[in-house]
């Protein structure tokens, strides 16, 4: 959240991202998550809303996407994959953040006239194939299947293979799985080389 709030895309440092998600003792079990419920409460913004902002309301219908929605969806997936693939204990999704729920949560209180209007989650959004929410939901299911279906995944170390903050790329390996991330907002790479274990 801090990186998204305080830095433009061009200033994101992959080495810092990897450090933040792996900064723990090897034997220390943790619960990893991209955002806490605090971001979903009224007065703050979720990751997806910080990335896409009001375009979530106007350009989340299939065929009507724009650059902001496509970028936000891609970054949301990458942030969640990085967080989930570096776990050492557990991964937490909650209250619709796995599919980019568009609204905040506001429980009945004096300040909102004791309204229940935003004390809900619209689970139907992820099932509507005419909207982009299902892209995030489908990705989340595939990601969880990969991590959960990989034998002894959490017993493997996160081994950094490469990072280049100038290119905004990094790679790490867990067992037989190799994860490569390009966080550059302006550059794609072909035949990008880095060292891996023999046989990878």
Language-model region placement:
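Conserved alpha/beta catalytic core and glycan-binding cleft of carbohydrate-active enzymes
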Residues: 1-110, 116, 148, 152-190
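Active-site-proximal helix/loop capping residues that flank conserved catalytic or ligand/cofactor
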Residues: 35, 74, 81, 134, ...
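Aromatic- and carboxylate-lined catalytic core of secreted/periplasmic carbohydrate-active enzymes
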Residues: 119-160, 198
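Beta-strand-rich binding/interaction modules
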Residues: 187-200
């Amino acid at each position: 959240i801090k990186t998204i709030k305080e830095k433009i895309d061009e200033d994101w440092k992959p080495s810092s991202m990897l450090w933040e998600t792996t900064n723990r003792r090897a034997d220390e079990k943790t619960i990893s998550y991209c955002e806490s419920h605090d971001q979903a409460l009224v007065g703050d913004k979720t990751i997806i809303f910080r990335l896409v902002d009001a375009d979530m309301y106007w350009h989340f219908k299939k065929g009507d996407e724009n650059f902001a929605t496509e970028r936000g969806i891609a970054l949301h997936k990458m942030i969640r994959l990085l967080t989930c693939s570096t776990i050492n204990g557990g991964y937490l999704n909650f209250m619709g953040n796995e599919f980019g729920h568009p609204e905040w949560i506001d429980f009945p209180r004096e300040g909102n006239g004791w309204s229940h209007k935003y004390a809900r989650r619209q689970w139907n959004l992820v099932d509507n194939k005419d909207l982009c929410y299902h892209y995030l939901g489908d990705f989340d299911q595939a990601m969880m299947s990969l991590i959960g279906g990989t034998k002894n995944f959490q017993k493997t170390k996160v081994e950094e293979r490469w990072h280049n903050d100038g290119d905004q790329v990094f790679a790490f390996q867990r067992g037989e799985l190799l994860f490569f991330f390009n966080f550059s907002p302006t550059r794609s790479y072909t035949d990008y080389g880095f060292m891996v274990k023999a046989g990878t």
